[in-house]
């Protein structure tokens, strides 16, 4: 099943569960990120 040890594209990025997981990931990432040595980091989902 799938690609062992690799990444595979999400078949439907508009699926409500995918959107919920992505929103959760971004929210958690934003809680842990911030300004470090004057640099802002951004998490991008395409």
UniProtKB/Swiss-Prot annotation:
The entry's keywords: Protease inhibitor, Thiol protease inhibitor
Sequence motif Secondary area of contact, location on chain: 35-38
GO molecular function, one term: cysteine-type endopeptidase inhibitor activity
Database matches in CDD domains: CY (cd00042)
Family classification: Belongs to the cystatin family. Phytocystatin subfamily.
Annotated function: Inhibitor of papain.
Protein name (database record): Cystatin WCPI-3
């Amino acid at each position: 099943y799938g690609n062992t040890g690799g990444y595979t594209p999400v078949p439907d990025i508009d699926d409500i569960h995918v959107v919920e997981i992505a929103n959760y990931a971004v929210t958690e990432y934003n809680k842990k990120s911030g300004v470090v040595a004057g640099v802002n980091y951004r998490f991008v989902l395409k």
